[in-house]
Structures are given as C-alpha cells and as structure tokens.
Regions:
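Phosphate/ribose-phosphate-bearing ligand recognition and processing surfaces
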Residues: 147-157
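Long, charged alpha-helical interface segments
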Residues: 78-105, 109-115, 129, 155-250
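Structural motif
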Residues: 3-4, 18-21, 41-44, 62-65, ...
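Short, structured patches in soluble enzyme cores that scaffold and shape functional sites
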Residues: 100-102, 120-121, 144-148
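Residues that scaffold, gate, or flank divalent-cation-dependent active/transport sites
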Residues: 4-11, 28-40, 50-96, 104
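Solvent-exposed alpha-helices and their adjacent loops that cap or buttress functional pockets
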Residues: 11-15, 36, 56-58, 87-91, ...
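Catalytic cores of nucleophile-dependent amide-cleaving enzymes
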Residues: 120-135, 139, 149
Length: 250
C-alpha cells in the first residue's frame, strides 16, 4: 500500500486505483462534514455559482444554497461556508447545494478515483479508518488531495494532511506492507514541526482571509479533533448508497 499526499489537485495522476481523501480544511471539507452530520436529504456539490443556480431551478423542492466566493456567501445564498454556523443549523431532510472557491473544484477533479472521502480535523480518526479499511479490503493505495488555494500550495491543508497520514499510519498492522510517498513524508514533517496549530492556521493565507471577514471563530471550531464521526463519501455507480453521501454536478 502506498500512502501519499498531493499538495494541489494538479499533482493528481492515475487515481482510478486509489482511495482519495480531499482536504480543504479552511473550510469546505470541514463545513461539508458538519453539514452531512445534520442528516440532510441530499447534498450536491458544484464548481460554479451558475451551476448552483441551474440545479436549484430544476428541483421540485426548494434547496438551500450554500457556499462562498472570497469567503462570503454569494448574493441570494442561504448559508456561507462556516462550519461553526452549520453546527447550529437545522438541516434535517433538506436539500443542500454547496459551492466553494477551492474545495468543490478539488473534489470534482478526483471523482474518477476508486472512492472519494472528505477529511478534516473534525473527522480525522473516522476518515483515516474509513480510507484505510477500504484500501486494505480492495488492495488500493491512499492519496490525500489538498485543495490548496487558488491552485497553489496551502500550508493549512498540508498540515491537516500530515495529521491524517499520521492517523492512517497508526492503524497499520505489523503484517501490512506499506510505504510513504514523498508527499506523505513532507506532510508528516510539516505536521510534526508546527506545535501551535491555531497560530499556523491564523498565519495561513486562507486563515488570514477568514479573520479578515470576521469569522475567526471558525478556525477555533474546525481545529477540534474527532468532534464528528461522520465521513462524507462520494455517491457513485459502484457506491450508490453511502451513509453520508454527496454527489457532484460536473
């Protein structure tokens, strides 16, 4: 088993035989983990506002439009991209359409993977176990895919990737052969180097943006480890009914 990290979606190659865990810790995968814990009826991800509005116009039920551009909810949206806000929201039985600047694009880029999960600090142990168990059962490799920021490296995602790699490694039995790719080793190094996780996130580009728009409480919230045992999972033809499933409108 190969465990590796891609620090941007552009690094991803030949993923049809891999289990992919997408990370956009500030804040899309954190928000989506919370959203799915609230047991909505459907969660649909899109890459553009135009696609969001198109899907909404085609549905017979009134969906909740959720997400952000430049950190804030676009005009006419019901919610933004705040995991702390979603934690207090009543989403039971609702249809949610979600779009974000970086996270949903990264997720869309890996839909051909053997299986796709969403990871963050909030569900770290749960997503690590889910990915590891699937990889062992189906003889697949594990690739953590960082969304990055504006198609570039993001230290917050890399740090979270290192944390998730460490959680997977802790699960590996002594009789399981595995190796860490260069990206996974680098992510572990980043995770081990920084001791003040909140300070790291505050100094990151995405973190500074969240602070600038007045949502610094999101950083405190999303750093809570293992708050939620929900693992968002892509709905596919081979995986039509995951417990916490989402679909992607390409």
């Amino acid at each position: 088993m190969l465990i590796d990290v891609a620090f941007t979606p552009s690094e991803v190659q030949a993923i049809d035989s891999k289990v992919c865990v997408v990370i956009d810790v500030i804040r899309a995968t954190s928000s989506l983990t919370v959203i799915l814990s609230k047991k909505p009826d459907k969660v649909i991800l899109t890459t553009t506002i135009m696609k969001t509005n198109k899907i909404a116009s085609q549905l017979t039920v009134h969906p909740l439009l959720c997400g952000e551009r430049k950190g804030l909810p676009p005009e006419g949206f019901d919610f933004g991209n705040s995991p702390a806000e979603y934690f207090k929201a009543d989403l039971l039985g609702k249809t949610v359409i979600f779009t974000s600047s970086n996270g949903t694009r990264a997720i869309a880029d890996v839909t051909v993977a053997a299986n796709v999960y969403l990871g963050c600090f909030l569900n770290g142990s749960a997503v690590a176990k889910k990915a590891y168990d699937y990889a062992v059962a189906h003889e697949k490799d594990i690739l953590f895919v960082c969304a990055g920021r504006e198609e570039k490296f993001a230290i917050d995602d890399a740090y979270c990737a290192g944390y998730l790699v460490s959680r997977v490694v802790s699960l590996i039995s002594s009789d399981t052969e595995f190796r860490l790719g260069d990206g996974a080793q680098a992510a572990l190094g980043i995770f081990g180097y920084y001791r003040d996780d909140k300070r790291l996130l505050e100094m990151s580009g995405a973190g500074k943006n969240v602070i600038d728009i007045g949502l610094s409480e999101d950083l405190t919230f999303l750093l809570q480890r293992d708050l939620i045992e929900v693992v968002p999972e892509l709905i596919t033809d081979n995986n039509p009914n995951p417990e916490y499933g989402f679909s992607v409108f390409l």
